[in-house]
Protein backbone atom coordinates (compact mmCIF):
# COMPACT_ATOMS: atom_id res chain seq x y z
CA UNK A 1 0.00 0.00 0.00
CA UNK A 2 2.87 2.39 0.80
CA UNK A 3 4.54 1.70 -2.55
CA UNK A 4 1.30 2.29 -4.39
CA UNK A 5 0.70 5.49 -2.42
CA UNK A 6 4.18 6.79 -3.32
CA UNK A 7 3.64 5.85 -6.95
CA UNK A 8 0.27 7.62 -7.09
CA UNK A 9 1.69 10.93 -5.78
CA UNK A 10 1.59 13.29 -8.74
CA UNK A 11 0.53 10.51 -11.13
CA UNK A 12 -3.25 10.13 -11.46
CA UNK A 13 -3.44 7.50 -14.19
CA UNK A 14 -6.19 4.89 -14.80
CA UNK A 15 -3.79 1.98 -14.14
CA UNK A 16 -3.00 3.22 -10.65
CA UNK A 17 -6.69 3.59 -9.83
CA UNK A 18 -7.33 0.04 -11.05
CA UNK A 19 -4.46 -1.28 -8.94
CA UNK A 20 -5.78 0.54 -5.89
CA UNK A 21 -9.25 -0.92 -6.39
CA UNK A 22 -7.79 -4.40 -6.87
CA UNK A 23 -5.79 -4.03 -3.65
CA UNK A 24 -8.93 -3.05 -1.76
CA UNK A 25 -10.79 -6.09 -3.09
CA UNK A 26 -7.96 -8.41 -2.11
CA UNK A 27 -7.96 -6.92 1.38
CA UNK A 28 -11.69 -7.54 1.67
CA UNK A 29 -11.28 -11.16 0.57
CA UNK A 30 -8.47 -11.64 3.08
CA UNK A 31 -10.66 -10.27 5.86
CA UNK A 32 -13.46 -12.68 4.98
CA UNK A 33 -11.05 -15.62 5.08
CA UNK A 34 -9.86 -14.50 8.51
CA UNK A 35 -13.45 -14.47 9.76
CA UNK A 36 -14.08 -17.96 8.38
CA UNK A 37 -11.15 -19.23 10.44
CA UNK A 38 -13.01 -18.42 13.66
CA UNK A 39 -16.53 -19.34 12.50
CA UNK A 40 -16.39 -22.81 14.10
CA UNK A 41 -16.24 -21.49 17.64
CA UNK A 42 -19.24 -22.34 19.89
CA UNK A 43 -19.94 -18.70 20.70
CA UNK A 44 -20.06 -17.79 17.01
CA UNK A 45 -22.34 -20.72 16.24
CA UNK A 46 -24.70 -19.72 19.05
CA UNK A 47 -24.82 -16.15 17.80
CA UNK A 48 -25.47 -17.28 14.23
CA UNK A 49 -28.22 -19.59 15.46
CA UNK A 50 -30.02 -16.69 17.10
CA UNK A 51 -30.28 -14.84 13.79
CA UNK A 52 -31.80 -17.70 11.81
CA UNK A 53 -35.42 -18.77 11.58
CA UNK A 54 -35.57 -22.54 11.69
CA UNK A 55 -37.74 -24.24 9.08
CA UNK A 56 -39.75 -27.36 9.85
CA UNK A 57 -37.90 -30.41 8.57
CA UNK A 58 -40.21 -32.81 6.71
CA UNK A 59 -37.75 -35.60 6.02
CA UNK A 60 -39.20 -38.04 8.55
CA UNK A 61 -42.74 -39.32 8.91
CA UNK A 62 -43.09 -37.67 12.32
CA UNK A 63 -42.26 -34.21 11.03
CA UNK A 64 -44.47 -34.74 7.99
CA UNK A 65 -47.40 -35.64 10.24
CA UNK A 66 -46.74 -32.56 12.39
CA UNK A 67 -46.98 -30.40 9.26
CA UNK A 68 -50.17 -32.09 7.99
CA UNK A 69 -52.07 -32.48 11.27
CA UNK A 70 -52.92 -28.76 11.79
CA UNK A 71 -54.56 -28.73 8.34
CA UNK A 72 -57.02 -31.56 9.07
CA UNK A 73 -60.02 -29.34 9.83
CA UNK A 74 -62.61 -27.39 7.86
CA UNK A 75 -61.02 -24.08 8.85
CA UNK A 76 -58.05 -24.93 6.62
CA UNK A 77 -58.48 -23.81 3.02
CA UNK A 78 -56.13 -26.56 1.85
CA UNK A 79 -58.23 -29.27 3.53
CA UNK A 80 -61.50 -27.87 2.13
CA UNK A 81 -60.01 -27.76 -1.35
CA UNK A 82 -58.75 -31.34 -1.08
CA UNK A 83 -62.15 -32.68 0.02
CA UNK A 84 -63.97 -30.56 -2.57
CA UNK A 85 -61.67 -31.76 -5.35
CA UNK A 86 -62.09 -35.41 -4.34
CA UNK A 87 -65.88 -35.20 -4.31
CA UNK A 88 -66.16 -33.46 -7.67
CA UNK A 89 -63.67 -35.83 -9.32
CA UNK A 90 -65.76 -38.74 -8.04
CA UNK A 91 -68.90 -37.07 -9.43
CA UNK A 92 -67.23 -36.51 -12.81
CA UNK A 93 -66.10 -40.14 -13.02
CA UNK A 94 -69.62 -41.30 -12.11
CA UNK A 95 -71.16 -39.16 -14.88
CA UNK A 96 -68.68 -40.44 -17.47
CA UNK A 97 -69.22 -44.10 -16.54
CA UNK A 98 -72.99 -43.83 -16.21
CA UNK A 99 -73.47 -42.13 -19.58
CA UNK A 100 -70.69 -44.17 -21.25
CA UNK A 101 -69.17 -41.07 -22.84
CA UNK A 102 -66.50 -41.79 -25.44
CA UNK A 103 -64.37 -38.71 -24.77
CA UNK A 104 -65.64 -38.14 -21.24
CA UNK A 105 -62.14 -37.84 -19.81
CA UNK A 106 -62.19 -34.26 -21.11
CA UNK A 107 -64.72 -33.49 -18.36
CA UNK A 108 -62.35 -34.85 -15.72
CA UNK A 109 -59.35 -32.97 -17.12
CA UNK A 110 -61.31 -29.72 -17.26
CA UNK A 111 -62.47 -30.22 -13.70
CA UNK A 112 -58.92 -30.85 -12.44
CA UNK A 113 -57.34 -27.89 -14.22
CA UNK A 114 -60.10 -25.36 -13.57
CA UNK A 115 -60.91 -25.96 -9.90
CA UNK A 116 -58.84 -23.72 -7.60
CA UNK A 117 -58.87 -23.23 -3.80
CA UNK A 118 -60.91 -20.00 -3.92
CA UNK A 119 -63.80 -18.54 -5.87
CA UNK A 120 -61.85 -15.75 -7.57
CA UNK A 121 -59.19 -17.99 -9.11
CA UNK A 122 -61.76 -20.60 -10.18
CA UNK A 123 -63.96 -17.97 -11.83
CA UNK A 124 -61.00 -16.66 -13.81
CA UNK A 125 -60.02 -20.18 -14.87
CA UNK A 126 -63.59 -20.97 -16.01
CA UNK A 127 -63.66 -17.98 -18.36
CA UNK A 128 -60.17 -18.66 -19.69
CA UNK A 129 -60.87 -22.36 -20.23
CA UNK A 130 -64.08 -21.80 -22.19
CA UNK A 131 -62.61 -18.98 -24.30
CA UNK A 132 -59.44 -20.92 -25.09
CA UNK A 133 -61.38 -24.05 -25.99
CA UNK A 134 -63.78 -22.26 -28.36
CA UNK A 135 -60.95 -20.45 -30.16
CA UNK A 136 -58.91 -23.65 -30.30
CA UNK A 137 -61.80 -25.55 -31.86
CA UNK A 138 -62.25 -22.84 -34.50
CA UNK A 139 -58.56 -22.84 -35.45
CA UNK A 140 -58.24 -26.61 -35.13
CA UNK A 141 -61.08 -27.16 -37.57
CA UNK A 142 -58.99 -25.45 -40.26
CA UNK A 143 -55.93 -27.65 -39.77
CA UNK A 144 -57.03 -30.50 -42.12
CA UNK A 145 -57.50 -28.01 -44.97
CA UNK A 146 -54.08 -26.34 -44.76
CA UNK A 147 -51.97 -29.28 -43.51
CA UNK A 148 -52.88 -32.41 -45.45
CA UNK A 149 -49.51 -34.14 -44.91
CA UNK A 150 -48.69 -36.26 -41.87
CA UNK A 151 -45.35 -34.52 -41.32
CA UNK A 152 -46.99 -31.12 -41.00
CA UNK A 153 -49.56 -32.43 -38.54
CA UNK A 154 -46.78 -33.94 -36.42
CA UNK A 155 -45.02 -30.58 -36.31
CA UNK A 156 -48.28 -28.94 -35.22
CA UNK A 157 -48.67 -31.51 -32.43
CA UNK A 158 -45.12 -30.86 -31.22
CA UNK A 159 -45.54 -27.08 -31.39
CA UNK A 160 -48.93 -27.18 -29.64
CA UNK A 161 -47.63 -29.35 -26.80
CA UNK A 162 -44.54 -27.18 -26.32
CA UNK A 163 -46.52 -23.94 -26.28
CA UNK A 164 -49.00 -25.48 -23.85
CA UNK A 165 -46.29 -26.14 -21.27
CA UNK A 166 -44.71 -22.74 -21.88
CA UNK A 167 -47.91 -20.77 -21.26
CA UNK A 168 -49.81 -22.85 -18.70
CA UNK A 169 -48.26 -21.09 -15.69
CA UNK A 170 -48.92 -17.47 -16.63
CA UNK A 171 -51.69 -17.43 -19.29
CA UNK A 172 -54.13 -20.30 -18.97
CA UNK A 173 -56.32 -19.22 -21.91
CA UNK A 174 -53.36 -19.49 -24.29
CA UNK A 175 -52.39 -22.91 -22.96
CA UNK A 176 -55.99 -24.13 -23.42
CA UNK A 177 -55.98 -22.77 -26.97
CA UNK A 178 -52.78 -24.63 -27.88
CA UNK A 179 -53.75 -27.91 -26.22
CA UNK A 180 -57.11 -27.89 -28.03
CA UNK A 181 -55.37 -27.55 -31.38
CA UNK A 182 -52.99 -30.34 -30.38
CA UNK A 183 -55.88 -32.62 -29.35
CA UNK A 184 -57.84 -32.09 -32.56
CA UNK A 185 -54.73 -32.57 -34.70
CA UNK A 186 -53.93 -35.79 -32.83
CA UNK A 187 -57.45 -37.07 -33.52
CA UNK A 188 -56.94 -36.25 -37.20
CA UNK A 189 -53.69 -38.24 -37.21
CA UNK A 190 -55.49 -41.18 -35.59
CA UNK A 191 -58.03 -41.21 -38.42
CA UNK A 192 -60.99 -40.04 -36.33
CA UNK A 193 -63.62 -37.56 -37.41
CA UNK A 194 -62.41 -34.17 -36.17
CA UNK A 195 -65.67 -32.40 -36.93
CA UNK A 196 -67.63 -34.89 -34.83
CA UNK A 197 -65.24 -34.35 -31.89
CA UNK A 198 -65.42 -30.54 -31.93
CA UNK A 199 -68.90 -30.15 -30.34
CA UNK A 200 -68.02 -32.91 -27.87
CA UNK A 201 -64.93 -30.97 -26.83
CA UNK A 202 -66.94 -27.80 -26.22
CA UNK A 203 -69.74 -29.58 -24.33
CA UNK A 204 -67.31 -31.51 -22.10
CA UNK A 205 -65.44 -28.30 -21.32
CA UNK A 206 -68.65 -26.52 -20.33
CA UNK A 207 -69.72 -29.46 -18.12
CA UNK A 208 -66.34 -29.64 -16.37
CA UNK A 209 -66.18 -25.88 -15.86
CA UNK A 210 -69.74 -25.86 -14.48
CA UNK A 211 -68.86 -28.60 -11.99
CA UNK A 212 -65.81 -26.64 -10.84
CA UNK A 213 -67.81 -23.42 -10.43
CA UNK A 214 -70.58 -25.19 -8.50
CA UNK A 215 -68.02 -26.86 -6.22
CA UNK A 216 -66.34 -23.64 -5.10
CA UNK A 217 -69.72 -21.88 -4.76
CA UNK A 218 -71.62 -24.46 -2.69
CA UNK A 219 -69.14 -26.95 -1.17
CA UNK A 220 -67.60 -25.11 1.80
CA UNK A 221 -67.25 -21.84 -0.13
CA UNK A 222 -64.29 -19.69 0.76
CA UNK A 223 -66.14 -16.38 1.06
CA UNK A 224 -63.63 -13.86 2.34
CA UNK A 225 -66.17 -11.71 4.17
CA UNK A 226 -66.72 -14.56 6.65
CA UNK A 227 -63.10 -14.35 7.84
CA UNK A 228 -62.51 -10.63 7.31
CA UNK A 229 -62.94 -9.70 10.96
CA UNK A 230 -60.50 -12.36 12.12
CA UNK A 231 -57.99 -11.50 9.38
CA UNK A 232 -58.13 -7.80 10.27
CA UNK A 233 -57.76 -8.60 13.98
CA UNK A 234 -54.69 -10.73 13.26
CA UNK A 235 -53.16 -7.94 11.18
CA UNK A 236 -53.68 -5.33 13.90
CA UNK A 237 -52.58 -7.63 16.74
CA UNK A 238 -49.44 -8.76 14.92
CA UNK A 239 -48.56 -5.14 14.15
CA UNK A 240 -49.09 -4.29 17.82
CA UNK A 241 -46.82 -7.16 18.87
CA UNK A 242 -44.22 -5.95 16.39
CA UNK A 243 -44.42 -2.43 17.85
CA UNK A 244 -44.13 -3.83 21.38
CA UNK A 245 -40.97 -5.71 20.40
CA UNK A 246 -39.47 -2.53 19.01
CA UNK A 247 -40.32 -0.67 22.23
CA UNK A 248 -38.63 -3.39 24.29
CA UNK A 249 -35.52 -3.15 22.14
CA UNK A 250 -35.51 0.63 22.59
CA UNK A 251 -35.60 0.21 26.36
CA UNK A 252 -32.86 -2.41 26.51
CA UNK A 253 -30.67 -1.00 23.74
CA UNK A 254 -30.54 -4.35 21.92
CA UNK A 255 -29.26 -4.20 18.34
CA UNK A 256 -29.12 -7.81 17.09
CA UNK A 257 -31.93 -9.41 15.07
CA UNK A 258 -32.70 -12.38 17.30
CA UNK A 259 -35.01 -15.14 16.13
CA UNK A 260 -37.98 -13.99 18.22
CA UNK A 261 -37.83 -10.46 16.81
CA UNK A 262 -37.53 -11.73 13.24
CA UNK A 263 -40.49 -14.09 13.66
CA UNK A 264 -42.60 -11.23 15.04
CA UNK A 265 -41.62 -8.99 12.16
CA UNK A 266 -42.35 -11.65 9.56
CA UNK A 267 -45.76 -12.45 11.04
CA UNK A 268 -46.73 -8.77 11.01
CA UNK A 269 -45.93 -8.48 7.32
CA UNK A 270 -47.59 -11.81 6.49
CA UNK A 271 -50.85 -10.93 8.26
CA UNK A 272 -50.93 -7.50 6.63
CA UNK A 273 -50.40 -9.09 3.21
CA UNK A 274 -53.15 -11.62 4.00
CA UNK A 275 -55.55 -8.77 4.80
CA UNK A 276 -54.74 -7.03 1.51
CA UNK A 277 -55.21 -10.29 -0.39
CA UNK A 278 -58.53 -10.92 1.35
CA UNK A 279 -59.85 -7.47 0.45
CA UNK A 280 -58.67 -7.91 -3.13
CA UNK A 281 -60.48 -11.25 -3.44
CA UNK A 282 -63.63 -9.78 -1.91
CA UNK A 283 -63.88 -7.25 -4.73
CA UNK A 284 -64.46 -10.07 -7.25
CA UNK A 285 -66.94 -12.12 -5.21
CA UNK A 286 -70.66 -12.25 -6.15
CA UNK A 287 -72.64 -9.01 -6.13
CA UNK A 288 -74.94 -10.26 -3.36
CA UNK A 289 -72.06 -9.74 -0.90
CA UNK A 290 -71.42 -6.15 -2.02
CA UNK A 291 -73.06 -4.67 1.08
CA UNK A 292 -70.48 -6.47 3.21
CA UNK A 293 -67.48 -6.01 0.92
CA UNK A 294 -67.66 -2.34 -0.06
CA UNK A 295 -67.36 -0.79 3.45
CA UNK A 296 -64.33 -2.98 4.19
CA UNK A 297 -62.28 -2.18 1.08
CA UNK A 298 -60.72 1.07 2.47
CA UNK A 299 -59.21 -0.93 5.37
CA UNK A 300 -56.24 -2.13 3.33
CA UNK A 301 -54.56 1.27 3.03
CA UNK A 302 -54.34 2.15 6.76
CA UNK A 303 -53.30 -1.43 7.63
CA UNK A 304 -50.46 -1.36 5.13
CA UNK A 305 -49.49 2.14 6.25
CA UNK A 306 -49.45 1.05 9.90
CA UNK A 307 -47.10 -1.86 9.22
CA UNK A 308 -44.90 0.36 7.06
CA UNK A 309 -44.61 3.01 9.77
CA UNK A 310 -43.77 0.39 12.40
CA UNK A 311 -41.10 -1.08 10.11
CA UNK A 312 -39.64 2.39 9.59
CA UNK A 313 -39.68 2.90 13.35
CA UNK A 314 -37.83 -0.39 13.84
CA UNK A 315 -35.19 0.62 11.32
CA UNK A 316 -34.81 4.02 12.95
CA UNK A 317 -34.62 2.43 16.40
CA UNK A 318 -31.83 0.12 15.23
CA UNK A 319 -29.87 3.10 13.90
CA UNK A 320 -30.46 5.09 17.10
CA UNK A 321 -29.32 2.16 19.24
CA UNK A 322 -26.26 1.59 17.10
CA UNK A 323 -25.26 5.25 17.22
CA UNK A 324 -26.03 5.75 20.93
CA UNK A 325 -23.12 7.46 22.72
CA UNK A 326 -22.22 7.52 26.45
CA UNK A 327 -22.63 11.34 26.50
CA UNK A 328 -26.18 12.22 25.56
CA UNK A 329 -27.60 15.63 24.63
CA UNK A 330 -29.99 15.61 27.58
CA UNK A 331 -28.06 13.37 29.95
CA UNK A 332 -28.53 15.87 32.77
CA UNK A 333 -32.18 14.87 33.03
CA UNK A 334 -31.36 11.16 33.48
CA UNK A 335 -30.74 9.43 36.81
CA UNK A 336 -27.15 8.56 37.65
CA UNK A 337 -25.64 5.38 36.12
CA UNK A 338 -28.37 5.22 33.44
CA UNK A 339 -27.14 3.12 30.47
CA UNK A 340 -27.13 4.94 27.12
CA UNK A 341 -29.96 3.34 25.13
CA UNK A 342 -31.84 4.41 22.04
CA UNK A 343 -34.90 5.26 24.14
CA UNK A 344 -32.86 8.08 25.67
CA UNK A 345 -31.64 9.46 22.34
CA UNK A 346 -34.70 9.15 20.06
CA UNK A 347 -37.18 12.05 19.97
CA UNK A 348 -40.66 11.37 21.33
CA UNK A 349 -44.15 12.71 20.62
CA UNK A 350 -47.03 13.09 23.00
CA UNK A 351 -49.96 10.70 22.25
CA UNK A 352 -52.19 13.43 20.80
CA UNK A 353 -49.55 14.64 18.34
CA UNK A 354 -48.61 11.10 17.30
CA UNK A 355 -52.25 10.10 16.76
CA UNK A 356 -52.98 13.22 14.72
CA UNK A 357 -49.99 12.75 12.42
CA UNK A 358 -50.61 9.02 12.00
CA UNK A 359 -54.21 9.68 10.92
CA UNK A 360 -53.10 12.23 8.34
CA UNK A 361 -50.35 9.95 7.01
CA UNK A 362 -52.75 6.99 6.78
CA UNK A 363 -55.22 9.14 4.84
CA UNK A 364 -52.37 10.15 2.50
CA UNK A 365 -53.22 13.80 2.87
CA UNK A 366 -51.41 16.79 4.33
CA UNK A 367 -52.62 18.24 7.66
CA UNK A 368 -55.14 21.03 7.54
CA UNK A 369 -54.16 24.61 8.34
CA UNK A 370 -55.63 24.61 11.91
CA UNK A 371 -53.94 21.29 12.69
CA UNK A 372 -50.63 22.55 11.35
CA UNK A 373 -50.95 25.76 13.38
CA UNK A 374 -51.85 23.79 16.49
CA UNK A 375 -48.88 21.46 15.99
CA UNK A 376 -46.60 24.45 15.45
CA UNK A 377 -47.81 26.01 18.69
CA UNK A 378 -47.31 22.69 20.50
CA UNK A 379 -43.79 22.40 19.10
CA UNK A 380 -42.93 25.95 20.20
CA UNK A 381 -44.31 25.33 23.68
CA UNK A 382 -42.41 22.06 24.11
CA UNK A 383 -39.19 23.53 22.76
CA UNK A 384 -39.42 26.46 25.20
CA UNK A 385 -39.88 24.06 28.12
CA UNK A 386 -37.02 21.77 27.12
CA UNK A 387 -33.42 22.18 28.20
CA UNK A 388 -31.12 24.30 26.02
CA UNK A 389 -29.01 21.33 24.96
CA UNK A 390 -31.81 18.91 24.24
CA UNK A 391 -33.23 18.18 20.83
CA UNK A 392 -36.75 19.23 19.89
CA UNK A 393 -38.93 16.17 20.56
CA UNK A 394 -41.98 17.37 18.70
CA UNK A 395 -40.48 18.18 15.34
CA UNK A 396 -43.02 17.00 12.77
CA UNK A 397 -41.88 14.99 9.77
CA UNK A 398 -41.72 16.76 6.45
CA UNK A 399 -44.54 16.44 3.92
CA UNK A 400 -42.32 15.53 0.98
CA UNK A 401 -43.31 11.86 1.26
CA UNK A 402 -47.05 12.57 1.15
CA UNK A 403 -48.15 12.23 -2.47
CA UNK A 404 -51.46 11.59 -4.18
CA UNK A 405 -54.95 12.68 -3.31
CA UNK A 406 -56.75 11.64 -0.13
CA UNK A 407 -59.08 8.70 -0.62
CA UNK A 408 -60.22 8.05 2.93
CA UNK A 409 -61.41 10.52 5.55
CA UNK A 410 -59.19 10.70 8.66
CA UNK A 411 -62.23 10.42 10.92
CA UNK A 412 -63.23 7.10 9.34
CA UNK A 413 -59.73 5.69 9.72
CA UNK A 414 -59.59 6.81 13.35
CA UNK A 415 -62.95 5.20 14.04
CA UNK A 416 -61.90 1.96 12.35
CA UNK A 417 -58.69 1.57 14.35
UniProtKB/Swiss-Prot annotation:
Domain of life (superkingdom): Bacteria
InterPro entries: Memb_transporter_dom
GO cellular component: plasma membrane
Pfam families assigned to the protein according to its UniProt record, in alphabetical order: FUSC_2 (PF13515)
Topology of this chain in the membrane: Multi-pass membrane protein
Organism: Neisseria gonorrhoeae
Descriptive protein name: Uncharacterized protein ORF2
Low complexity biased stretches: 366-398
Keywords of this entry: Cell membrane, Membrane, Transmembrane, Transmembrane helix
Membrane spanning stretches: 87-107, 130-150, 177-197, 202-222
